[in-house]
């Protein structure tokens, strides 16, 4: 079974998260997509609780699976103590699915800081990495890729053009300031946020 791993705080999940997952399902040879909800140690005042973030991640998975069941939520990072590191999550995935190939899905911003990740070279040795980048960022990414020393195989990193710019931070700000936001998140998540007054003065 071929696995893909997509991690994040999902505070909240939004349409770019959904589009990325659907894109990965269509373009990559994967059988299961694991959505891992990470710890949020730098929690802001208007960040949602772990329980809410987990519930919204489940709604994201339902949106993904509406057109073909492939995704599931992992709460392992939330249930362990301490900060979240991708290398530790990969170790856990390897315990659950020994010998199964894993593809790590990341956005362009994360790739720019990839060399600051804990054990980043080991990550490249243990899984494939797919970077979703903006179409106009080719030169910058080619340069960043060229300066990653110690890559065991140049084919371990693949780039996919993905022109869908959204951030959870911007959505939280929009909600807090009373701006429209429902068009930025899947409908089920918009309903969840509204019914629980998340990220607003009433939360």
UniProtKB/Swiss-Prot annotation:
Coiled coil: none annotated. Its EC number is 2.7.7.18. GO terms for biological process: NAD biosynthetic process. Keywords: ATP-binding, NAD, Nucleotide-binding, Nucleotidyltransferase, Pyridine nucleotide biosynthesis, Transferase. InterPro entries: Cyt_trans-like, NadD/NMNAT, Rossmann-like_a/b/a_fold. PANTHER family: NICOTINATE-NUCLEOTIDE ADENYLYLTRANSFERASE-RELATED, PHOSPHOPANTETHEINE ADENYLYLTRANSFERASE. Belongs to the NadD family. Catalyzes the reversible adenylation of nicotinate mononucleotide (NaMN) to nicotinic acid adenine dinucleotide (NaAD). This is Probable nicotinate-nucleotide adenylyltransferase. It comes from Prosthecochloris aestuarii (strain DSM 271 / SK 413).
């Amino acid at each position: 079974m071929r696995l893909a791993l997509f991690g994040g705080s999902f505070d909240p999940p939004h349409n770019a998260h959904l589009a990325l997952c659907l894109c990965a399902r269509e373009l990559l040879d994967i059988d299961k997509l694991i959505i891992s909800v990470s710890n949020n140690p730098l929690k802001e005042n208007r960040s949602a609780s772990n329980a809410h973030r987990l519930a919204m991640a489940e709604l994201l998975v339902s949106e993904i699976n509406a057109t073909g069941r492939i995704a599931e939520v992992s709460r392992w990072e939330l249930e362990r103590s301490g900060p979240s590191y991708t290398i530790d999550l990969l170790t856990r995935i390897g315990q659950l699915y020994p010998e199964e190939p894993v593809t790590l899905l990341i956005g362009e911003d994360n790739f720019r800081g990839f060399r600051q990740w804990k054990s980043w070279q080991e990550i490249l040795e243990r899984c494939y990495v797919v970077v979703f980048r903006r179409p106009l960022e080719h030169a910058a990414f080619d340069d960043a890729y060229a300066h990653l020393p110690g890559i065991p195989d140049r084919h371990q990193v693949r780039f996919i053009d993905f022109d869908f710019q959204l951030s959870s931070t911007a959505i939280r700000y929009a909600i807090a300031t009373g701006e429209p936001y429902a068009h930025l998140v899947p409908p089920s998540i918009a309903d969840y946020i509204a019914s629980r007054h998340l990220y607003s003065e009433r939360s």
